[in-house]
Design a protein with these regions (language model features):
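Short, compositionally biased P/S/T/A/G/V-rich stretches that sit at domain boundaries
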Residues: 1-3, 104-120, 352
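Aromatic-rich carbohydrate-binding modules that target alpha-glucans
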Residues: 2-3, 8-64, 70-103, 133-170, ...
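Short edge beta-strand/loop segments characteristic of extracellular beta-sandwich folds
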Residues: 18-24, 124-132, 605-607
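Hydrophobic faces of well-ordered beta-strands that scaffold small-molecule active sites
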Residues: 208-210, 251-253, 297-299, 402, ...
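Active-site-proximal helices and loops of the catalytic beta/alpha 8
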Residues: 287, 291, 305, 310-316, ...
Length: 638
């Protein structure tokens, strides 16, 4: 069941609800709360047993939240909540029946001078007003004696969101709201506050990222198939002309540290680069060349779990309760592994990605999705916290930021404390595959934008939603993330997804989506090979998109390559695309038209995802003819 125990004021959300979740205890050794707030992942919201029930209290923004429980790895809805729905998120291939919690305060209209309701970015101040769905007919911002009409930006299950944007304002701002509601005139305010700026380094906003999985990218003996394909950091260094030549000025590397797998998400040694990838020497030489070229670098940090073969975990396996590292992991009992487990391991009967094992080959520890190779770290341990801080700080002497793997499987407060110990220039993004609000603002500057990816899939790839519905999803992300939206890492695909080109089956539609990615708010990123039309395979699990890079240029799609370079050049040379406001002009059917503008610069982006010609109107009375599955970007100035 769930219960709400009032609200607490919050400088980001205005207020948060105290929500208690509980479920009967039935002999499980552990339990976790799962939900749309942590992408239904174990690890982040561990429950406490009191008597005959598991309990946890969390602070949640108002709205509708989907949730369930993990009882020693067993997924279970709330048996005491009859409100159930099928929750589907194509972005991380989740579709299950889950429980639904509604969290809402008493007021029909709400505003607070907090970060998500009053913020400054790019020389502009944004005002946001929230109302119960259907309550407000219109709303007006009263500012300095002027009436400014507010635009209805988005709606969700409970609320309508209204917004207004004005030029930058100095010092405290005095303002109020007027309007018409279903019950007559309404008035809210006055308020007096200083608009809030998000604390984050500015350099990421001017970047276009290129993501590389080193084993699959370049090397002296790169193979087209197999587990280990032979790519390394020496090969990557030799191919920087290709990356820089297209205009990419930031690089994201998947894990490069010592591990037993090609992908590196089972780290054995956090302080040394994998010898298979060229070791520390290759990394140092790569960093020198990146700095010479002005290319920023972020690394992939795996701190939800380690490898089974990490020395700390091996010490626990050998010494059991006497190990000094027993508190490093979520150990459930002793011995940590059975004798039959060790025999199966030594005889090669336990492949690293298995979730099952021969009869009797048991293990007594929590792990990433029940994979024995990846034992879960104990995020409550102060030793683990200091270890993570030390590792991240060590590599930030050479790198410029971190992407944190399975960030939604670690408590949000853990990342808040980590960020406090990092240099202010470091760009920190988390892998949060659903609603990321609990992880943004205080913890991460941005997240891998799975919320946007979900909307992109449904509109561009699957055609499940109309342009009007697509716009609503865009604006919901915007009101929920506020200025942090500009720091989101936006993508069409990555190492955990299928290649976008494989999903859309059409080069023209792929380029339409790429044009949107490069001209929308947030930081655009391209997965290696997308620029040449590299294909993967559908239904291939996590390996679906991890095709080795093709370096024979006769195999490249020149049309995609040239358009990618042109879009990157446009992005890097446009402050409007990096910092500018977003103004929807036309979102109808399969056509979207919007303006990005700042100061004296204005670009209009028109994208036709339909199979017919479309004529659209532009500001200033001009019109534009768009062929099927095409886009145009027009410099309209001011």
């Amino acid at each position: 069941m769930y219960k709400t125990f009032g609200f607490v004021e919050d400088p980001v959300f205005g207020r948060l609800a105290r929500v208690e979740f509980s479920i009967p205890y039935r002999g499980e050794r552990y339990a976790y709360l799962l939900g749309s707030f942590n992408a239904f992942n174990e690890g982040s919201f561990r429950m406490e047993r009191r008597g005959s029930r598991w309990f946890i209290r969390v602070l949640l923004p108002e709205g509708v939240w989907r949730y369930a429980f993990s009882l020693e790895g067993r997924f279970e809805r709330d048996p005491e909540n009859e409100n159930v729905e099928t929750y589907r998120r194509p972005s991380y291939k989740f579709e299950k029946e889950v429980s639904v919690a509604g969290v809402i305060g008493p007021e029909p209209v709400y505003h607070s001078p907090s970060l998500l309701y009053l913020y400054t970015f790019g020389g502009r101040v944004n005002f946001v007003l929230r109302a119960k769905k259907g309550y407000l007919v219109s709303s007006t911002l009263i500012l300095k004696g002027k009436d400014i009409e507010m635009r209805k930006r988005a709606s969700d299950e409970l609320f309508d969101y209204f917004g207004a944007e004005v030029g930058n304002l100095e010092g405290p701002v005095e303002y109020s709201f007027l309007g018409e509601s279903s019950e007559g005139p309404f008035e809210l305010g006055p308020f007096s506050a200083v608009p809030i700026a998000l604390k984050a380094p500015e350099w990421p906003l001017e970047r276009v990222f290129y993501q590389v999985m080193p084993d699959r990218f370049a090397g002296n003996c790169l193979r087209d198939s197999g587990n280990f394909c032979g790519g390394d950091l020496w090969g990557l260094k030799e191919r920087l002309d290709h990356i820089a030549g297209l205009g990419f000025n930031a690089l994201y590397l998947t894990p490069i540290f010592e591990s037993t797998t090609y992908h590196g998400y089972d780290v054995v040694d956090y302080f040394h680069v994998s010898r298979r990838l060229g070791g520390d020497e290759a990394f140092d030489e790569l960093v020198k060349e990146l700095r010479r070229r002005g290319i920023k670098l972020i690394l992939d940090g795996v701190f939800h779990h380690t490898s089974f073969f990490h020395p700390y975990f091996q010490d626990v396996v050998e010494k059991g309760e006497e190990s000094r590292y027993v508190g490093f992991y979520r150990i459930l009992g002793f011995p940590v592994v059975s004798k039959r487990f060790l025999r199966a391991l030594n005889s090669g009967l336990l492949p690293g990605d298995t979730r099952s094992a021969p009869m009797g080959a048991e293990w007594n520890y929590e792990s990433f999705y029940s994979v024995w190779l990846m034992p879960r770290l104990n995020s409550d341990s102060e030793e683990v916290f200091e270890f993570v801080v030390n590792v991240m700080g060590y590599w930030l002497k050479k790198a410029d930021g971190w992407r944190l793997d399975v960030a939604h499987g670690v408590p949000p407060d853990f990342w808040v404390r980590v960020r406090e110990r990092m240099p202010s220039s470091a760009y920190l993004i988390g892998e949060v595959m659903d609603d990321a609000r609990l992880y943004l603002f205080r913890g991460f500057h941005g997240v891998m934008n799975y919320a946007l990816y979900d909307a992109i899939l449904k509109f561009f790839a699957f055609g499940e939603i109309s342009a009007e519905e697509f716009l609503n999803e865009l604006e919901l992300i915007s009101v929920r993330y506020g200025p942090a939206e500009y720091y989101a890492y936006n993508f069409l695909d990555n190492h955990d997804t299928e290649r976008f080109l494989d999903l859309v089956h059409d080069e023209r539609l792929y380029l339409c989506a790429l044009a949107f990615l490069m001209t929308y708010k947030g930081i655009p990123a391209v997965f290696y090979g997308d620029e040449i039309g590299l294909r993967g395979r559908l239904g291939g699990g996590l390996d679906a998109g991890r095709t080795p890079m093709k370096w024979r240029e006769e195999n490249w799609n020149r049309g995609i390559l040239e358009t990618t370079g042109e879009l990157i050049h446009l992005r890097r040379n446009s402050k409007a695309l990096q910092f500018g406001t977003f103004r929807p002009l036309l979102f109808r059917g399969r056509t979207i038209v919007y303006e990005r503008a700042i100061d004296g610069e204005s670009l209009v982006v028109a994208i036709n995802c339909s199979e017919v010609h479309v004529k659209v109107s532009l500001p200033g009375g001009k019109s534009l003819n768009l062929p099927p599955l095409s886009f145009r970007i027009v410099d309209t100035g001011r």
